[in-house]
Regions:
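Bacterial Sec-dependent N-terminal signal peptides
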Residues: 1-14
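Solvent-exposed loop/turn segments at secondary-structure junctions
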Residues: 26-28, 72-75, 118-122, 231-234
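Acidic/histidine-rich helix-loop elements
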Residues: 26-47
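N-terminal post-signal-peptidase region of extra-cytosolic proteins
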Residues: 43-55, 85
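Post-signal peptide N-terminal segment of secreted/secretory-pathway proteins
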Residues: 51-60, 73-81
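Proline-aspartate-enriched helix->loop->beta-strand connector
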Residues: 62-68
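Hydrophobic, often amphipathic alpha-helical segments used for membrane interaction and targeting
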Residues: 80-217
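A cross-kingdom marker for long, charged
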Residues: 199-259
Length: 259
């Protein structure tokens, strides 16, 4: 019997590898990004209770691998996790350890998996462009600062679970990626294009991250990968993964606490 004029295909969704992307702010205030959240003390009793709740709800995803924002070629992260398993390391205040290590131990994982690529530095000084393109850089600064202010305000009122749920909303992903197209991509002329070059380098880093993530499931089926990364990365990774049919992306919000 014909099926709407289309060839019927076998449903392989059950064999697909699954990815959940948890976009975070940096709990430990490393100030390594252009725009940074002023995180409060995640080691306080209140925040520790909230982190435990986030970890418990994330456990329902049942990840087979936990991928973290740490250089993929550096063994220090997993070595630290091994010490943590042996009771020889106290969790620091980064989201990688507070959520990543804690969850991995809860689930009995023998390893955690760093998948980041080295940050690719720009070869131009934004200050040099202040004259002709100052209006774009000014708008970028104002927009970025406004986003950080909103997150900082939410931090005073909401739990970590609620903050993460907001960060991982589609509207936040769109706002994040839009910054690159709206304020950086237009910068430059035919013989000098620092804006497109900056966007290209950001894309390259995130494509390398995706490469490392994909390697975790290479040649396997039914893997369930949880990626814990800065929200600026996960917004772009979701975009890339929409074109990778071998992976099914699940909405992380269903695995975050409701309050």
């Amino acid at each position: 019997m014909p099926v709407s004029g289309q060839l019927a295909s076998k449903d392989t969704s059950a064999q697909k590898n699954t990815i959940a992307l948890l976009g975070t702010y940096h709990f430990n205030n490393p100030n390594q990004d252009q725009f940074n959240v002023n995180s409060d003390d995640v080691l306080s009793a209140k925040r520790q209770k909230e982190i435990a709740q986030v970890t418990a709800t994330l456990a329902a995803y049942k990840p087979s691998h936990i991928a973290l924002e740490f250089n993929a070629n550096d063994t220090a992260m997993d070595a630290r996790y091994q010490r943590y398993l042996k009771g020889q390391h106290t969790l620091n205040n980064s989201e990688l350890e507070q959520i990543g290590f804690r969850l991995a131990k809860m689930l009995g994982h023998p390893h955690v998996y760093p998948v980041d690529a080295p940050s690719i530095q720009l070869d131009f000084n934004p200050g040099e462009l202040a004259g002709e393109y100052g209006y774009l850089l000014e708008q970028l600064g104002k927009t970025g600062d406004s986003i950080m202010t909103q997150i900082n305000d939410r931090m005073k009122k909401y739990t970590i679970g609620q903050i993460l749920a907001n960060l991982n909303a589609p509207a936040m992903d769109k706002l994040n990626v839009e910054l690159y197209y709206k304020y950086l991509l237009p910068i430059g002329k035919s013989d000098n294009q620092p804006g497109p070059e900056a966007v290209t380098r950001w894309y390259k880093r995130n494509l390398l991250v995706l490469h490392h993530i994909m390697k975790l499931a290479e040649g396997k089926n039914n893997q369930r990968i949880l990626v814990i990364f800065g929200q600026g990365h996960t917004a772009m990774l979701k975009q890339f993964l929409s074109y990778v049919s071998d992976f099914r992306v699940v909405n992380i919000q269903q695995f975050l606490p409701a309050n």
